[in-house]
Amino acid sequence: MSIVQLDHVSVTFKRKKAADVQAVQDVTLHIEKGDIYGIVGFSGAGKSTLVRTINLLQKPTAGDVVVGGVDFVKDGKQVISGKDLQARRRKIGMIFQQFNLLNETTVIENIAFALKHSDLSDDELEEKCHKLLKLVDLEDKANAYPAQLSGGQQQRVAIARALANDPEILLSDEATSALDPQTTIQILDLLKKLNRELGLTIVLITHEMAAVKKIANKVAVMENGRVVENGNLRDVFLAPKAELTQKFVGGSLAVVDTLKSLNISLAENEALYQLVYSLNNVAKSIIIELYREVGVEASMLYGNVEVLADEPVGTLLVMVKGDADKQKATLKFLSDEGVTVTELDERGNRL
């Protein structure tokens, strides 16, 4: 079941002395409960504007927004009351590139600030804050001030604060962009842990495909306010259709570059296939087994292994020699082995 439904959402910024800016254009995304949904694109693509329509920090000018089964926006008009929206927002945590901590208060006081409207007693409040600090591995920093913390530690405090009201959804807007690579990995690992242990749905806004590749299970690629491609991470990453997605991913371009450098000309009995398969499920050599079982010669032209959300996935580009019956048998064998096959022409285009 979708916990977030964005249907035909658009955001247009009106300007008096210049043309209107269409920041988001006719975007439809359905995010399931428990997803880590990556939204990736270059600066100015509309990612941050789009994610803010989920909690109505940015009101759409068109389309529908439904969160947790509750209508927020219908046909570009807010239909949820201000009071109800305030209550629902407490179930949607959000973290940013800037940590937005209160510098004059301690770590534990920063977290407690998010609970100032709760009904918790002082003892219950302190207990909850310490529990949140433990969750983000900062138990020993309760009485420290933000200036005494590293960037990664400050982001952990921001995450703990965002979790204070037990949200169902966490919106992460470029939360790792200001961090070094090692700290970025640590924060992404923490988000993955929260998703796993709390069942937290996470919407991950980033311009870094590596971040999406590491923890997301689904991805949408944005350009000029539009979603140009979206789907399961494995499908989008390993068989990108849009040109922008290919630029982000790189793997598809590597196949094209390989074919360009080899300058292949296929004979009538030859075919090019891109093979994609999980190394967890297919441990044996596909090329050797193909020869043994089908009796065709397969030449490997390109090979690569990517780790997608902790799953090692292999990509091979092979040229198979054989008549029509052999090619048909090849496709059946590979399909039976759990291999995703895409036939390509000499330039790397899908057939």
Curated annotation (Swiss-Prot):
Keyword line: Amino-acid transport, ATP-binding, Cell membrane, Membrane, Nucleotide-binding, Translocase, Transport
Main location per the UniProt record: membrane
Residues that, per the record, bind ATP: G41, F42, S43, G44, A45, G46, K47, S48
Keyword match Translocase: yes
Protein location: Cell membrane
GO MF terms held by the record: ABC-type D-methionine transporter activity; ATP binding; ATP hydrolysis activity
Enzyme class: translocase
Subunit structure comment from the entry: The complex is composed of two ATP-binding proteins (MetN), two transmembrane proteins (MetI) and a solute-binding protein (MetQ).
This protein's name: Methionine import ATP-binding protein MetN
Organism: Lactobacillus delbrueckii subsp. bulgaricus (strain ATCC 11842 / DSM 20081 / BCRC 10696 / JCM 1002 / NBRC 13953 / NCIMB 11778 / NCTC 12712 / WDCM 00102 / Lb 14)
